[in-house]
Amino acid sequence: MRLYQIQPREYSMLIFAFSLSGGISAFLAAFYIDSYDRKTVLLTAFFFFALGSILCSFANTYHLMLFARFFTGLFGGLLGGVSTAYISDMVPYERRGKAMGILNLGFGLASIVGIPFAIFICEHMDVFWPFRMIGILSLLTLIPAILYLPKMRDHIPPDTNSIKDIALAIASLVVYPFTYYLFPDLKIKLQSHISKIAEVLQVLKDRNLQNALMFGFFLVLGHFMFISFINPYLVGNLGFKLEDTKWMYIVGGISVSLTSPTIGKFIDTLGKLKSFRILILLSFIPILVISHIHEASIMMALLICAFMFIFNSGRMIAAQTLITGAPSEEQRGKFLVIRSSLIEMSEGFSALIGGLILTRDEVTGHLQNYNYIAYIAVLIGILCIYLASKIEVNSE
């Protein structure tokens, strides 16, 4: 916020731009996601995400950064849904909690290494270097991913159209009245793609999948509404120095890394729904505590944040496992990408709503009304407990 001299509202728009574009692209991808190899889609999106990150590193004005975030989100929005679908296709439902725990272990390690390293770079170089590093490391990661990740094609229908056919059918929509009657081949292909739209609409009409989608949307809404502003809250209200905030991510990341595999096994053993209820209720405690203290030592604040990371991560593992069991194998790709679209939208709206509720005292630098954000997050969490009970498992 200091770099561009912006208020919380403008800061939230940077988050919203990424999430909005990610939500749009993920929803559009739902129409064709099950027609292609998961690996191809995943790595293509990852490549353009890397390019978008490099573009962010050259954004020396607020509006240029806004555009760069929007571009990056177009491809970042696909990664969550496609990677979850990839794992779900590989791992049966009864062992999926452990798999999601291992996936979350990766996020924990990223917090331990990535975020503190980014803060270190910001201190000693400039704030744009982390974006460059993300882009470069992402491009380097593509090499082993291309070589070693297995293809995932079992979900692809035998009558799948080629990319050329899809492009031709989409182009024909522009001159639909002419192509429909003058070119029978295009008419047939267009009808084929309209049937894909019907398949997506069928997913959206399924009551069980509606419950799963709403559950995922509100869970992320409550989580990100609170977590998006934790960093400026620690600096502005609890007196953290900017360089001290890296310890929150180090401690939180280590905590998540140590506990995620165990939590995943716990979820598989106790049951997905019961585990989720326990973990989300426990997550309310650090959320309410951290948002209501006015003074705290760094050690005390870090301890509270560690528990917040552990329980938030745990409830997300349980939620992901519940959600991936809702669709059938044939519906899974479309469903998870639609879910990814809603999650991106949810993240964006959570930041936008938080930016409207929060204000910053120009004299003290304190963020005001953060406790109201915590209350809303808890109420949304209670709603999620109800929605989780409505989800039925239909796939293995």
Describe the residue ranges of each PLM region:
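Helix-breaking motifs and short loop linkers at transmembrane-helix boundaries and internal kinks
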Residues: 5, 37, 58-64, 293-295
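Residue-level signature of mid-helix packing/kink "hotspots" within the transmembrane helices
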Residues: 19-27, 111-112, 253-261, 348
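Conserved MFS/SLC helix-loop-helix module at the cytosolic interface between two early adjacent transmembrane helices
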Residues: 24-60
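Cytoplasmic helix-loop-helix junction between adjacent transmembrane helices
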Residues: 68-106
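Helix-loop-helix hairpin linking two adjacent transmembrane segments in secondary transporters
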Residues: 102-150, 169, 176-179
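Juxtamembrane intracellular "pre-TM" segments in multi-pass secondary transporters
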Residues: 153-172, 180-213
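Extracytoplasmic gate region of multi-pass secondary transporters
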Residues: 209-249
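C-terminal transmembrane helical hairpin of 12-TM major facilitator-type secondary transporters
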Residues: 273-318
